[in-house]
A protein has these predicted regions:
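N-terminal membrane-targeting/pre-transmembrane regions
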Residues: 1-44, 48-52
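Short beta-strand segments
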Residues: 3, 116-118, 143
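Hydrophobic alpha-helical transmembrane segments
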Residues: 56-71
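Conserved beta-hairpin
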Residues: 76-117
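Short, surface-exposed charged micro-motifs
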Residues: 97-99, 124-125, 134
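Generic beta-strand structural signal
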Residues: 101-102, 128, 137
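Phosphoinositide-dependent membrane-docking surfaces
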Residues: 107-108, 116-131
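A membrane-cytosol interface segment of integral membrane proteins
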Residues: 132-174
Length: 174
């Protein structure tokens, strides 16, 4: 059986990849980062509140504390989009779209820059979102496959195929 995908590595796709990494391979580190971020936000709020209770005038320090808190909150709520934005900036020329062919032995991903053959043993985690299948190789690397462009079979057939070939269950990411 042979499955084919044509995928664009755009903001939407890279956000799905970032979310899959955050919720699987990076889960423990992400949780620690979120706790640290929220502690900094709470500290900024406490510092501003303490100065207000002491009836001290508003200073540049208060403005900076407020700014840090707002920026951290924005990043904490849009973490996947921010990571996708920076990942898109790091894409090498000619790698913004890929055609992938999955066969029994391996799969090949072809971009304008190169064609690369991958073996299923290298996959650490298989994920699925509403629009993409995601194969993760490490904390830093993964690939997305657009379900809308799947040819050679159905999404259900591909799920069975990729689960069998990688030996990994599929993690469903919302």
């Amino acid at each position: 059986m042979e499955f084919q995908f044509e995928t664009r590595y755009d903001q939407k796709g890279l956000t799905a990849l970032a979310r899959a990494l955050r919720k699987t391979i990076r889960k423990k580190r992400s949780r620690r980062s979120h706790i640290f971020g929220w502690c900094i936000v709470a500290l900024a709020i406490l510092l501003i509140a303490a100065r207000r209770l002491l009836d001290e005038p508003w200073t540049l320090r208060d403005t900076l504390n407020c700014g840090v808190g707002v920026i951290l909150i924005a990043i904490l709520f849009t973490e996947d989009q921010v990571n996708a934005f920076f990942a898109q900036k790091k894409l090498l020329p000619g790698t913004s779209s890929a055609k992938s062919v999955f066969t029994e032995e391996s799969y090949t991903s072809t971009t304008e820059a190169a064609a690369t053959e991958f073996h299923y043993e290298a996959v650490q985690q298989v994920c699925e979102t509403e629009d993409y299948f995601v194969l993760l190789f490490s904390r830093q690397h993964g690939q997305i496959y657009d379900k809308a462009s799947l040819s050679g079979g159905t999404a259900e057939e591909f799920r069975s195929f990729i689960t069998e070939k990688t030996g990994k269950p599929i993690a469903y990411i919302k």
